[in-house]
Amino acid sequence: MEPKISPIIMRAFSSLLLVLSVQFSFACGWQVSPETSRLALFKAQREGFFKLTPFYYSADYYYATNTVSGVDQEKNCLEWKKKLGNNINTEDVHVILYETDSEQFQTAFENKTLKTVFSKNTFVDALLLSKNKAFLNYILLAKMLEYNNVQDTKWESWGQIRSNYNSNQLNDNFDFEKKIKSSKDTFLKQRYAFLALRYYFYAQQKQDVVRLCNTYFASESNTILKPWALYYNALCIDNLPLQNYLLSKVFNSCEEKSFAVLQHYNWKLTNETLALAQNDEERSVILAIESLRNPAPDLKSIKEIYELSPNSLFLSFLIGREVNKLEDWIFTPQYTNDGTPSVTFSSTDWYENYAKAKEENFNKDILYLRELEYFLISIREQTSGEQKDYITAAIAQLCFIDDQVDEGKKYTNLISDKANASIQMQKNIQLALVSLKQDDLKDEKVQNQLYTYFNSVENLVETDHGLFKNLYSLYRIASSDFYKKGDVVTAGLLSMKSDIKNEGEYSAYNNPYFFSYIGYFDRNASVKDIDLLMALQQKTNKTPFEKYICSGTIAPNSNYYKDLKGTIAFRNNNLELAYETFSSMPQDFWEKNYEYKTYLNENPFTPKILQKQEERKFDYRFNKTDFIAKLIQLKKQNTASSNLQLAHAYFNVSYLGNSWMMTSYDWSSGASYTDYVYGDNTENEKKYQNGNYYNLKMAKMYYEKALKMSKNSNEKAMASLMIFECNYYNHYAELITEEEEAKNPFKAGKELVNFYSIYKSTPTFKKYNCPLLSSFIN
């Protein structure tokens, strides 16, 4: 929101001093994290993407996720099943290894109650067999090592053990090497070696870590322990390119350590690391890791990886990142009120000349989009299976970003019916985009088909919270398209859907409040639109689409909409419609809802600008119906006195008055939360009541009528003084620089001259005269 207070030092006088206090937001303005407003529609996935989740494009340092890969744990459980017998349930193995408290397991063993405590657990049953005693002893040692040397704190665990628990720490003379060598079984030998290796790592015995890894995990082996051991080994090596190379091997071979790998990876050593790679596959992985943290255009890396490994999983993921970047750079400024991408670069100055920067960046981004699109089209036929469907979906999405709807539709239809569920979901999003751009949005069949597309994504959101952002983005675009087609009601409800989805999993805890139901319509709706909205609210036989857009968005009380309708009518100077609407509502509505009782509590016929703070009374029972009725009555009287009262009233319903909430639902001296959610409302507010809200046009008109009609010197003095006030605040309604003020300084006018000459003997003059006021005519 543009500032509404002149930055220059303005002369003021104590009796007329306006104290602008922020009533709904901080003066410095409302801000949210860039990631919150970022748009993203593309979320197609290939099998294996799960471990890459933290590296999706994001304005945050890493992409937030509610899910963690359990693939490595599953592999470990399968290894135990293969070793101890196929009759073991891997879920039972998981319970013991990853879900059972160490204290609970050790206590049960010491009390000889393992079989009772873990009844029907096939893994425990197998461990208790006499032939498997060595494996049970290993589990006991592994559980013991889950504790650190610090009493009461578990090692690598969020939980806390009981204060009276004996942690059974390793004795100082415990010999890992002896334990490893005495194990005749290779399976156990490797597992003891891994326990020792990890123990040495935290004890900072780096040489022992490297030695154990080279001794027990260097040979070809499919055990999941190998990449785990290699991870600790890499972190104990001082040669940074070699450390990078080993970390890249870990990254490629397991899921659990992918996030940790990128946290420890040493950047800007690309060439040195690549020199250690043994084949194209390894080189492609190193290049992929380097690209996963790059927020800038990176088609160069994608092309290089494609040449090395055309069907690479990482190649697909990086293509998706590029699509998400372009969505951010193009869609986020287009569909959000913030107006800039979530990620900006220091070379781009969005603040000096926003329009120029936006146009230049849009043109640059479109050129890059087409370069990426043409590359993907050129390689599409050389790919196959899941990779081909993924690239096809990416091409389609790029077409939609570029507003090439027909081309987007063409590639969407080329996605195989056998594509995985994630790509099918992406296809539904893209079919929804086609419908929004090309179909008759008023057609019931079209709307219900849109509901089907929307719902297909909704059904997946509980298992992947990342889809909340896709729904937020889809509904925001859908809202814009319905608005462009003239359907403000649907646009508003979809906009609210978008805001709810943007709250993500926390939306269940946030109950909509009064203004959230009407905020969009306050900015965009006409009286007719509100009538249509109320009709939809009352409709009993809603279509599936209507039920969907109304769910969680429609106001529970029709009087919310009536209040807005009456307010819009008042802004439009339709007092009769405003009265009709307000009078149909419960007359205690403004005492029980929103913030009316807090901000509509002063006499609207006493100009706030003429009152000292201590003179103001906040016990006025404001009733909108009665207020409008009074205005209608005063207009009919059309006397000097009635026009003076009308002028006072219109002054007070302006931005400067004590009854501004009669005209607007929020007041701020800077950007507010409502501006962030619904857009800057300044231009709309400038039009309220023919410019009265900021420029006091109607107030001045009635003061001039009162001055002209009155025969009473005191009334004329009051009218003259207030005309001066209207002129003064009208002059400073817009942001004025010192240079502009010098070229066009404020001039008091004849009304103030008359106030100090013709009316200087009136009670009004004696009450409000002061040196600062007189300085305007000296």
Which sequence ranges carry the predicted segments?
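Bacterial N-terminal signal peptides that target proteins for export
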Residues: E2-F13
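Phosphate/oxyanion-binding loops and surfaces in catalytic or ligand/nucleic-acid-binding neighborhoods
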Residues: M1, V19, K325
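N-terminal signal peptide c-region/cleavage motif recognized by signal peptidases
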Residues: V22-F24
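Extracytoplasmic/secretory-pathway proteins
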Residues: F26-K181, T186-R198, A203-N778
